[in-house]
Swiss-Prot record:
Function text: Catalyzes the attachment of proline to tRNA(Pro) in a two-step reaction: proline is first activated by ATP to form Pro-AMP and then transferred to the acceptor end of tRNA(Pro). As ProRS can inadvertently accommodate and process non-cognate amino acids such as alanine and cysteine, to avoid such errors it has two additional distinct editing activities against alanine. One activity is designated as 'pretransfer' editing and involves the tRNA(Pro)-independent hydrolysis of activated Ala-AMP.
Name assigned to this protein: Proline--tRNA ligase
Species this chain originates from: Shewanella baltica (strain OS185)
Record-stated family: Belongs to the class-II aminoacyl-tRNA synthetase family. ProS type 1 subfamily.
Lineage: Bacteria, Pseudomonadati, Pseudomonadota, Gammaproteobacteria, Alteromonadales
GO biological process: prolyl-tRNA aminoacylation
Amino acid sequence: MRVSKYLLSTQKETPANAEVISHQLMLRAGMIRRNASGLYSYLPTGLRVLRKVEAIVREEMNKAGAIEILMPMVQPADLWVETGRWEKFGPELLRFKDRHNRDFVLGPTHEEVITDLIRKEVSSYKQLPLNLYQIQTKFRDEVRPRFGMMRSREFLMKDAYSFHLDVDTMNETYEAMYNAYSNILTRMGLAFRPVLADTGSIGGSMSHEFHVLAQSGEDLIAYSTGSDYAANIEKAESPVPTEPRGAATEELRLVDTPNAKTIAELVEQFDLDITKTVKTLIVVGASEATPLVALIVRGDHELNEVKADKLDLVASPVEMASEALIRDAIGAGPGSLGPIGLNIPIVIDHSVSVMSDFAAGANVDDKHYFGINWERDLPTAQVADIRNVVEGEPTPDGLGTYAMARGIEVGHIFQLGTNYSKSMNATVLDENGKSQVLLMGCYGVGVSRIVAAAIEQNFDDRGIIWPEAIAPFSVGILPMNMHKSHRVTDIAEQLYKDLNEAGIDVLLDDRKERPGVMFADMELIGIPHTVVIGDRNIDAGVFEYKNRRTGEKQDIPFDQLLDFLKNAVKG
């Protein structure tokens, strides 16, 4: 490709409304342009990267035995009514009516459509197992689209759905998809971690997320320092204390604490060890019989709402009770709450169950109890894992301790079981002629999100540093003053021809432009390898080569450059 015949569209200035580096660089590099909130057009450079990501995803899915199909983005509402998600999904589901007043949605996901398709097309166990995938546009009406392609309303996704009659083949397909996702991200040259994850609104049993590691990642990953164990912070298991509860050494006493509205203030004013304090959080209960529930964690720990959501007593999704409700039921406000004398159900974290001589609110404004001990002062409450893990704690496999990293979720695989097939009556006849409900798996990759995540992991102060496999161009040719030198023009044109014939994606900057601008554009759009051609190089019989990632420069003899670049591009 010649720059003179290409829509390069680079920008010097960083757009004011772009918060994260991938959004900034995708705009500056001329990859995307905003049409409306969360909606973008891909320009040629962006589309080249997107198509390369898409190609790798497609190749690995095909290798894993999945079969490509294509389903409509517009979906009839009655399918969503069947599964109950018409009411449950919320405002992210964009709903509309056609000219005949029939309800439709813009698909944020395709479980309903694929299940409807399979129940009509598959009738016998002989047709199973089956794994179908598509690469299709999705739409989620995010309340606040931000971060460019990291959280846009319209995005490109690969979603696959598998169908089974037995758990064994479902497990085999799940493992195949796990390996395929690992291969996809490895081929793209990205540092990533597969992590245990919560199934979220889609539902199901086993689930893994695939995270590209980046400091800007929205998700916190807890991983083992001594094994492959890793989990989303929402899913990471807290260790059950092995040490017995300490004996009581203090008397229970009621203390005036008028200026201690938070744990931090309490600890500072009374010189307490924060691990000897607890936080009492009041959430909405799951039934009229238990309208409020108290969740108690240690003062230095944080409540894990995903874990709390799974408690039978707690309403789903977890909702913090209002101060008015709390005062009406307990008689005190947040900041003065604790377990003694509490007239609502209590669930405490494992770490709280082994505490002794601890401090908590007295359920009277501006008062706390110090020296609280279980059994002596109150019975031990229901115990559960309801907190986030912290660095340094032992991991559940016993092979290391927790460390933390930030990640960007780009893939998610689920074992759905019968969540959708049962509600939609998707059945087949088994070997005995008996009707059986299908087991399902679901496997998603954010194709357009990978593009942004790759940038978040690969950039410097000059621009993007693309991994080889997904770069828009592998080689950039920079001829110095080619419009004034026939020698430079001839050699640049010959190299351009040779690289094209070798099947290497090459961009020739044939503009009448200053060298500084040419260099800046090549580095901004992240071309991995650049070759500089000038009269001085020609006189010396060498090309000047520069590696974008390392910054290394080399003089390569004319007759060796083509082989050198072929090897460099292969990595």
